[in-house]
């Protein structure tokens, strides 16, 4: 069976922690930030956990499953 290729766009967007959680960046932070509150922008800086509904799909893209 051939080696499974990692989807490179997914590899740049997601990180897997030691505990197996998949972390992602928040959306709505790249532009049009002038109208957003400072607290909202600060909250968008933090990483977020990928939902369990999407976890298997992301793992398949990363070649881990």
UniProtKB/Swiss-Prot annotation:
Keywords: Ribonucleoprotein, Ribosomal protein. Belongs to the bacterial ribosomal protein bL35 family. This is Large ribosomal subunit protein bL35. PANTHER family: 54S RIBOSOMAL PROTEIN BL35M (PTHR33343), LARGE RIBOSOMAL SUBUNIT PROTEIN BL35M (PTHR33343:SF1). GO terms for cellular component: cytosolic large ribosomal subunit. It holds the Pfam family Ribosomal_L35p. One of its GO terms (molecular function) is structural constituent of ribosome. It comes from the Bacteria. GO terms for biological process: translation.
């Amino acid at each position: 069976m051939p080696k499974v290729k990692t989807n490179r766009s997914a590899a740049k967007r997601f990180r897997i922690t030691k505990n197996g959680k998949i972390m992602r960046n928040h959306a709505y932070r790249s532009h049009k930030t002038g109208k957003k509150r400072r607290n909202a922008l600060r909250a968008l800086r933090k990483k977020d956990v990928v939902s369990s509904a999407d976890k298997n799909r992301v793992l398949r893209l990363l070649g881990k499953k």
